[in-house]
Amino acid sequence: AARRIAKRVAAIRTGDPEPPPERVREALADVVGRCIYGVDLNPLAAELAKVSLWLETLDPGRPLAFLDAQIKVGNSLIGATPALISGGVPDEAFTAIEGDDKKIAAALRKQNKAERSGQDDLFGDPGSALPASVGGRFGQLLGTSRAASLADVHARQQRLKALEDDQTLQRQRLVADAWCAAFVWPMESGAPKAVTHGRFRALQRGEPLGPETLAGVHQLAKDYRFFHWHLAFPHIFRQEGSGDGSGGFDVIVGNPPWERISLDDAEFFELRAPEVLGVGTTAKRKAEIDGLALSRPDVYAEYMAEMRFGQTLSRLFSKSHLYPRAAVGRLTTQALFTERILHLVASRGKVGLVIPTGVLTDTPMKDLWAWLVDSRRAERLLDFENSKKIFPIHASYNFTLFTANGGSPEVDSRLEVAVRLSSVGELASPGSSFCVNVEDLRLINPATRQLPLCRDQREIDLLIRITRQANSIPKRGWVGFTSEANSKDYVDVYREAHVPLYEGKMMHQFNPSFATYADVGVDDRRSGKPRRTHPSEASCPARPRFWAPESTALSFLATKGLPSTEWLLCVRDYARASDERTVITAILPRTVP
């Protein structure tokens, strides 16, 4: 990014579209010193980013660029905003999770609710905007020309420290830290007094928190590395006179981490205690993990601490209203980063991301996608299959080069789409992508605005024409046929009064015996990998992996209001977007849950 900007700057300065290399290097030093920003959770990664930029701008006889004010350390997903601070601490912050005392959590929630409706809150936010003068001083520091000597670098370091130590900025940072801390506060006996709404408002008015609570806020800020963008870069996010941080970055590009927020048992125990992963069901694995409290107390304590850390993050992400569209279902960093970044870019800015396609197309992300379409932020979605192993993930895993804007009202209403690409070079081929108007997406899929599975412009135009001219099919309720019984009741050998537990992978189109666990090895059975049936077995019922109590199955069917017929038409729950058939059905006996 820095090289591209530098070449353009040099071209403008020289009037030559292909400027001399020395003028590009000169421009690159200015670009790095004024335009490039970054945040990383890992301090070492932040330092390596600086080193990389220094190597790019190395100029013998001149000091390295001063980057301390631009490359910073912190968790860029966890941070308050002026608008959320203005709203105070919501009651949902005190939702009990693993390790919390439910009675204490309930009491804090009740206290918070009373404080939110009390007289102290009648006049709202006591003030959360940072004076424009603070941002102006940061802008002046970064707007100066490149340091000519080591003394200039030291002078800038001292100026930055003075700005960071500004009392107004420090107070606002404490307020923002306290707001975040409320969502990850330990609700247990002996813990310091939590940051409830009343204490938070008092802090905003300049009243002290109390030594124990203050120490707790500082410790949590250190542990979770809260990062408040509007305070870290006040010259980028202007606040005075607005209800939220306005402004933002002109361009944001990146490939955010693709991870789940929740703790992955397999990843955690793979090296620490692999024996707990060798059991069949979730319930059995949980029992094995609980047994570590006696056999391996150190591993168990570390596991519980990691699990609580993940749950506190989930509570903050889902209850704080930081991510109203992306913090749904199983939380992932890629979805959260996508929504976060779209709020960090300026209204006339641009965003370019490499993200899993599911961030934009999966059902849990329907609200995020609908917002992107309705606000006309989405501009380009180039979907790639990983068949050439661009990323170290499964070949069938799709990722997208996603381009968006900051919400400017002057943008085009068309969205460019390409699907199932395997290389960037394919984009040069005619017809490799198609365009669709966002108004047509509302027509085709009014509920979620989801993209139809079209391969070229001809298919999307035909679908739009059919949708406009044909009558729509009325909505009809249907019942998802799945197993909702508790896995602790499952058994892996047949018992009397038990029925087979049927899995979607065991059926295919009009074929209830597509796969079976009969004569399957222990490892494949444990990992849920049935074998394909032979044509000679077509008339035989597929052998399941587990059986469930018949009473559990009948109770489940009754709650779903299913008919009392002996046979039911079942729909397979999952299908790949690339499958020829995305609705796979078979007829199964009613005795199969």
Regions of interest found by a model, annotated:
Residues 23, 325-332, 356-360, 389-393:
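Alpha-helix capping and helix-loop boundary segments enriched in small/acidic/polar residues
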Residues 52, 70-71, 76-251, 256-257, ...:
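Polynucleotide-recognition surfaces of large bacterial nucleic-acid defense/processing enzymes
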Residues 41-48, 222-229, 326-338:
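Phosphate/oxyanion-binding active-site loops and adjacent basic polyanion-contact surfaces
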